[in-house]
C-alpha cells in the first residue's frame, strides 16, 4: 500500500482498466473501485456512467493494479504543505481490520538523484565562478 502524507491524488484513466483500493485509517473503511475511461464502479456496482476523475486526499492508503490489457492514466496530484519527497512513495504493509501499518520499503530508495553531476571538477569550478 502507498500513503502520501502530503499529496492529494486526482486519477483519470484514459485507456484500459485500473483497479483501485483505498483505505481510510481514521474510519477503518475500505472501498474498491474499477475505473475505465467511461465508467466507474465502486465495490463492484456502477457508481458513475461516464468519464470521471477519482480523487482521494493525503493520508489515504491506496493500491492500484492495471488490467490485463494494460492501462494509461494521468494523476494530477497536488501537494500540501506537508509534502516531502523523502516519504511520499513509501510502501506499507497495512492491516485493513485494525488500521495498523508498518513501513516495508522506504520510497526514497527509489527516487532519482536530482543533483547535476559535473563531468569534472574544472567545469564545475568554471561554472560556479560565473
Question: In which residue ranges do the predicted regions lie?
Answer:
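Histidine-centered metal-chelating micro-motifs
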Residues: 19, 51-64
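Active-site region of the double-stranded beta-helix
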Residues: 1-48, 68-72, 76-130
Amino acid at each position: 500500500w502507498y500513503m502520501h502524507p502530503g499529496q492529494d491524488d486526482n486519477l483519470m484513466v484514459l485507456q484500459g482498466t485500473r483497479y483501485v483500493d483505498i483505505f481510510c485509517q481514521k474510519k477503518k473503511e475500505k472501498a474498491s473501485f474499477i475505473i475505465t475511461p467511461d465508467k466507474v464502479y465502486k465495490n463492484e456496482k456502477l457508481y458513475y456512467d461516464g468519464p470521471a476523475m477519482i480523487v482521494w486526499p493525503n493520508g489515504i492508503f491506496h493500491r492500484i493494479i492495471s488490467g490485463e490489457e494494460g492501462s494509461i492514466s494521468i494523476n494530477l496530484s497536488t501537494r500540501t504543505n506537508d509534502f516531502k519527497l523523502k516519504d511520499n512513495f513509501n510502501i506499507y504493509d497495512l492491516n485493513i481490520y485494525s488500521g495498523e501499518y508498518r513501513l516495508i520499503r522506504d520510497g526514497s530508495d527509489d527516487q532519482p538523484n536530482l543533483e547535476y553531476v559535473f563531468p569534472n571538477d574544472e567545469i564545475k569550478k568554471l561554472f560556479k565562478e560565473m
